[in-house]
Regions:
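Short, low-complexity N-terminal intrinsically disordered segments enriched in polar/charged residues
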Residues: 20-64, 169-170
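Short beta-strand edge/turn micro-motifs at domain boundaries
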Residues: 21-26, 138-166
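Bacterial N-terminal signal peptides
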Residues: 8-16
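Positively charged n-region of N-terminal signal peptides that target proteins for export
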Residues: 1-4
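Generic short beta-strand segments
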Residues: 120-127
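A solvent-exposed, acidic/Ser-Thr-rich amphipathic alpha-helical stretch
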Residues: 39-40, 58-112, 121, 133-136
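Residue-level signal for tight coil/turn positions that link beta-strands
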Residues: 113-115, 150
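Extracellular loop and loop/strand-boundary signature of outer-membrane beta-barrel proteins
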Residues: 129-131
Length: 170
């Protein structure tokens, strides 16, 4: 009788373990699909940033791309700690040069709950508004995104620097 009880308990536990494994596989599949959708959404957001930036539509860059409390850390400049400061930075830069992003490739995007981390490389040209030939550039960037209450992603932190080697030393 004891052997039969143990056998029944073993079969029940085995059945429960099998059903839990199936649920876990389904949960993993759903989670993976959610992560893939989030990665695609962030890559689409970056592509929209490129489109708006190239059109010099900086007001829409602010509303579409950046979180309300975003911080931009450009090289050799103080951190821009508000969307208004970021907008002013874009506008001042645009007064001097025409920046055109040819490509922006997100090399890696990692999702962690309501935060995401991405790094990539942009290439393009800078043309002085005062005249002169376009100068090619390549930069690497690192961004942190946060999921908003409406489930949209927005950039919370952005920093970038030149991807080219230093051509002169002080």
């Amino acid at each position: 009788m004891k052997k039969q009880i143990w056998l029944v308990l073993f079969v029940l536990l085995l059945g429960m373990a099998t059903s839990c494994q199936k649920q876990d596989v389904n949960a993993v599949g759903k989670a993976k699909a959610g992560v893939e959708a989030d990665v695609a959404a962030i890559k689409a957001l970056i592509a929209e940033w490129v489109r708006l930036y190239n059109a010099e539509d900086f007001e829409n860059v602010m509303s579409v791309f950046y979180a309300q409390n975003a911080i931009l850390m450009s090289p050799n400049a103080p951190a821009c700690r508000t969307k208004e400061a970021i907008l002013l930075s874009y506008q001042k830069e645009s007064e001097l040069d025409i920046q055109h992003v040819d490509t922006s490739v997100a090399e890696d995007v990692r999702i962690c709950g309501d935060s995401a981390f991405a790094w990539g490389i942009d290439t393009g040209t800078t043309t002085p508004r005062s005249g002169g030939d376009p100068v090619p550039y390549s930069v690497k960037w690192l961004m942190v995104f946060e999921r908003q209450a409406n489930s949209a992603w927005k950039c919370l932190y952005e920093m970038w620097n030149d991807n080219n080697p230093i051509t002169h030393l002080p």
